[in-house]
């Protein structure tokens, strides 16, 4: 029995699926671009998110934790908030009355 046509059809079908659904898969570079410092072993996005949680715990309703977390993801951890530095957390503060 000649299996070459079956193998060729399977290969073509897999290739078509990859082409069709390839855009749905995230690009690897999206997750590795300046997110992780390979020399120091630091994941900047994770540090940023942890600091957002810490600030939310410390400041409660005065701090917009979700907005802080979204900015960590959007900017890939480039602007890490420091709960004791008013300038770094100013965009996430609420003025409650």
UniProtKB/Swiss-Prot annotation:
Cellular component per GO, a single term: extracellular space
Intrachain disulfide bonds: 48-72, 52-68, 55-83
Extent of the signal sequence: 1-17
Pfam families tied to this protein: Eclosion
Keywords, sorted A to Z: Disulfide bond, Hormone, Neuropeptide, Secreted, Signal
Entry-linked InterPro entries: Eclosion
Chief site of localization: secreted
Tissue-specific expression: Expressed in a single pair of brain neurons which extend their processes the entire length of the central nervous system and also to the corpora cardiaca portion of the ring gland. These cells show massive depletion of immunoreactive Eh at ecdysis.
Molecular functions (GO terms): ecdysis-triggering hormone activity; eclosion hormone activity; neuropeptide hormone activity
Biological process according to GO: ecdysis, chitin-based cuticle; eclosion; neuropeptide signaling pathway; regulation of eclosion
Compartment(s): Secreted
Family under the similarity heading: Belongs to the insect eclosion hormone family.
Role noted for this protein: Neuropeptide that triggers the performance of ecdysis behaviors at the end of a molt. It triggers adult behavior patterns: larval, pupal and adult ecdysis, and plasticization during the molt.
Protein name: Eclosion hormone
Organism of provenance: Drosophila melanogaster (Fruit fly)
Organism taxonomic ancestry: Eukaryota, Metazoa, Ecdysozoa, Arthropoda, Hexapoda
């Amino acid at each position: 029995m000649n299996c070459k046509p079956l193998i060729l059809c399977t290969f073509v079908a897999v290739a078509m699926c990859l082409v069709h659904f390839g855009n749905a898969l995230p690009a690897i570079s999206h997750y590795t671009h300046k997110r992780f410092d390979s020399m120091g072993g630091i994941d900047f996005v994770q540090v940023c998110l942890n600091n957002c949680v810490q600030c939310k715990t410390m400041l409660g309703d005065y701090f917009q934790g979700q907005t802080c977390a979204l900015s960590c993801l959007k900017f890939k951890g480039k602007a890490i908030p420091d709960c004791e530095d008013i300038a770094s957390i100013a965009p996430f503060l609420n003025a409650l009355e």
